[in-house]
C-alpha cells in the first residue's frame, strides 16, 4: 500500500510554497502448505519488506515576468528487510536544488539548475543541468546537458542471500559495501513538429557513466575449489541441493566506465474523427568496460523496442465505445557472462474495449472486456533460463467500474 499528503501556500499569484510527502510499503510473504522450518500449514513467513519515504519542500517564484525560479529540499529514506539474507538496513538521501527558467526572446527559452545529493553510505555530489529550447511555428528544438548521480541500492550494497528461483535454479547474491556511486554526463537533442492533428519527434542522446553498478553471474561449479568451500560454509543450504549444476553466484561490481547512446522516434496522428494512431521506436546501445578491461553489453539492456497503439472512440447518445489495440515488440535482453544465456525477444498484442453507459441520474457504468496476448505468445524454454516474456499465454480480461456523478 502507499499513501501521501501535500499542501500549498500561495504567497501571491506567481509565488507558491509547496510541501509533499509520499510513502510506500511493500511486503511479500510465503504461505506454507506443509509443516516446514518450524511453520505449520497455513502460516506465513515474511520474505521481503520494503519501505520508502519521501518528503519534499519547494518554493516556486516568478521574480520577473518572463522567468520562473524553483528552490527546494528533499529527504528520502529507504528500508529493506530480507530475513533470508539477514538483511535489515535503511539508508537516507538528503538533497537541495535550485533551477531558473527564463524566456530570453520570443522564440528562445533557457534553463539552468544545480542539485546536491548526499547519500548516507556513499557521500554527496553536485550535479548541474543546462537546457535550451528554440521554437518557431510548429517546430521545437531542445538541447540538454545534465550531470547525474546515483548511489548503489541497498540490495547492491548488502545482499548476502541464497534463494531458490524457478524450477531447479538457485542463486547466491553477494552485495559489496565498497561499491562506488554512479556519476554520469548526459547530452541530448530533440526535434519536434506538432500540429492539431499530428505530431512527430526525434531525440538523440549520449550518456557517459563512470562507476556504473552492474552484476555478473557465475556457475558455482566453475568457481575455484577454495571459493566453493567458503560459500558452502556461509550458505549451508547448498548442502540441501541434489546438484549444484543449476546454482549461480551473482556478484555486484562497478564498471570502470560505460556508454549508452541511442535515439527515440515518436509519431502520433488523429487520422479521422475518433481514431488516434501512435507509435514509438527506441534504439539503445549500452556497453560497459568490465574488470577484465573488455567492453561488454550492459546487463538487462535491450537494443530495439517498439510500441504501437490504435485507439477509437465514438458516442451514440448515452453510450460510448472505446476500442484500443496495442502492441509491444522488443529484441533480446542481454545477460553478458551469464551461463543461462540471453532472454529472447518477443512481440505481444492486446485488444481492450470499454463501454460507457451514461443514461443514469447518479452514476455511470463502465464494463470492459479484452484479450491480452492475442496471438498466444509464450516462452516455453526450461525454467533454468533467463526470461523476458512471462505471459502464460492468451487470456480474457473483464472489468467493471462504477463512477458516481
Each PLM stretch: what is its role?
Residues 19-23, 71-77, 112-116, 132, ...:
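Transmembrane beta-barrel strands of outer-membrane/channel proteins
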Residues 65, 70, 103-107, 206-208, ...:
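Gram-negative outer-membrane beta-barrel transporters
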Residues 146, 276-283, 297-405:
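Conserved C-terminal beta-signal and adjacent last beta-strands/turns
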Residues 1-122, 128, 135, 201-204, ...:
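Face-selective signature of the C-terminal outer-membrane beta-barrel domain
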Residues 84-87, 120-125, 134, 138-187, ...:
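Surface-exposed extracellular loop regions of Gram-negative outer-membrane beta-barrel proteins
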Residues 12-14, 62-66, 105-109, 135-139, ...:
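Outer-membrane beta-barrel channels and translocator barrels
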Residues 42-58, 95-97, 180, 195, ...:
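Outer membrane beta-barrel strand-and-loop segments of large Gram-negative receptors
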Residues 5-9, 55-61, 96-102, 130-134, ...:
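Residues on the lipid-exposed face of transmembrane beta-strands in outer-membrane beta-barrel proteins
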